[in-house]
Amino acid sequence: MATPPRAVARFSLALALALLATACGSGGTLSAKALSQEAKTLSSEAAEGALLAQDGAAGKSTRIYTRVHSEDLYKAAAQAASSLQKAKTTPALGPKLRRTARLAQKVSADLKRLGHASRTEQRALARELFAAAKELK
């Protein structure tokens, strides 16, 4: 039996928040491992959003499903983007943190648009989200 997509999105959000809380707790700095895990989680959310956009554009998923699932993905990505904007890290990891935070903002914005996008827009969003997923790896 497959795991429902909403459960996967909720688990991903909980995992990302736990990692950021652990990494940033008590005024500490975000570790390289936590930053890499955050990028991996965002990459997964972007890839899932891209597949959702492709299916929506091809008429393989309903507009309601696309809207609801993209909202779940958006919430997870928006929370990660917010946390990354506030995060601190070592100077050596600063560029990676800024890049990951910028991509998190973009993924979040794309996922928010996806829920109400036309099929043409969904095709463009699929390309953008796949590119973001690849860049986050």
What is the meaning of each model-derived region?
Residues 1-13:
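Bacterial N-terminal signal peptides that target proteins for export
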Residues 25-29:
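Bacterial signal peptide processing site
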Residues 116-124:
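Short, exposed beta-strand-loop hairpins at the edges of beta-sheets
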Residues 34-111, 123-135:
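Alpha-helical segments in soluble extracytoplasmic regions
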